[in-house]
Amino acid sequence: MDLQKIKNQILDGRNLCIEDAYELENAPLNELLEAANEVRAKFCGNYFNFCSIINVKSGKCSENCKYCAQSAHFDTKCEIYDILPFEKIMPLAKLNDDAGVARFSLVASGKGLHKKDDLQKVIEIYKKLKSHTKFHLCASFGIVSKEILAELKKSGVKTYHHNLETSRKFFPKICTTHTYDDRINTIKSALCVGLDVCSGGIFGLGESLKDRIDMAYELKNLKVSSVPINILTPIKGTPLENSAPLCVDEILRSIAIFRLILPHVFLRLAGGRNNLKNSVKTALNGGINSAITGDFLTTCGDVAQSDKNLVSECGFVYKKSFDV
C-alpha cells in the first residue's frame, strides 16, 4: 500500500477504491493526516463553515436507537417537550446569526413529523427565521415523506439532515425499529425534491473501522454534500452507557480516511468532539473543514468566537455563506 500514490491519484481526481481504503488501517497516522489535509485544501480550499442546532422537540421517541437519550425505550431522564414556540427559538437564532454562524437547524425527536400540527408549526417557524435571519436553514426531523420534504423546502429549508449512523451491516445491532433502507430512502427523497443533504454518523458504537469505511462509501454513492462526524458520548440509561471510548488516534484515522473517500464534502466535526481531548487542532489539520458550534438555548456567542479563533489558528478562513 503506497499512501503517496493513493494521495496523488485522489488529487488527480480519481476515486479511492474501497480495497485501498481498507488498507489505510495500517498507514502511518501522521502521513495519513497530512494526505487528508492536502486533499481537503485542493478540493475545498481553506474556507471553514459553522452551523448550529436547536432541539425543538425532545423525548418520547418511538425508535430504539441504542445510543440515544431521547428514545422512549430507555430510562434516560431526558427532558420532554413538544415543538417550541418561535419566541423561544429566536433568541438562540439571533445569537448564532450575530456570531456569524452560517447554518441553523431545527432538530426534533421522533421517527418523523407525523402529526400535521407539528409540520405546520415548524413551517411557520422556518418562514419567520427566513425573514428575520441570514441563515442557510436546515432541518432534521427523521424519516419523512417526499411530500413533507417538499413543504419544508417551500418554507425556506435548504438542507435536510438525516444520518446513516453506521454501516448497513452494523446498523441492525444499533436499531431494530426501522431499517437502513428507511434512512437511505429519506435521503433520496430529500435529494429528489431539490434539497441538499447532510448525512454522516457516529464513531464508537462498537463498529469496526471497516464499518466506518463502508458507511463513507454509502454516503459517497448518495452524493451528500455535508458529512457530520459524531463521536459517541455514552448516555446513562441507554444500552451503550458503558461503551469504551475510542482512542484519539482511531478517531483521527477515521476522519482522515473519510476525507480521502469524500474529497469534496463539508466534513463536519459534530457531537462528542471532547473525545478528541487536545487533538481538535489535529483533526482540523486532518480533513475537517466545518463544525457544529453552540448548544441548545445556551449563550453561543462566546462558543462561536472561540471556535472561530481555533480554526483561524489552523489557517482557515471563516466564511458565513458560500455554496456547498
Curated annotation (Swiss-Prot):
Catalytic activity, reaction form: (4R,5S)-dethiobiotin + (sulfur carrier)-SH + 2 reduced [2Fe-2S]-[ferredoxin] + 2 S-adenosyl-L-methionine = (sulfur carrier)-H + biotin + 2 5'-deoxyadenosine + 2 L-methionine + 2 oxidized [2Fe-2S]-[ferredoxin]
Molecular-function annotations in GO: 2 iron, 2 sulfur cluster binding; 4 iron, 4 sulfur cluster binding; biotin synthase activity; iron ion binding
Cofactors that this protein relies on: [4Fe-4S] cluster; [2Fe-2S] cluster
Chain sites annotated for binding [4Fe-4S] cluster: C61, C65, C68
Gene3D superfamilies in the record: Aldolase class I
Keyword RNA-binding: no
Domain called Radical SAM core: residue spans: 43-273
PROSITE patterns: RADICAL_SAM (PS51918)
The keyword Zinc appears for this protein: no
SMART domains: BATS, Elp3
Annotated family: Belongs to the radical SAM superfamily. Biotin synthase family.
Assembly: Homodimer.
Protein name: Biotin synthase
Gene name, Swiss-Prot/TrEMBL: bioB
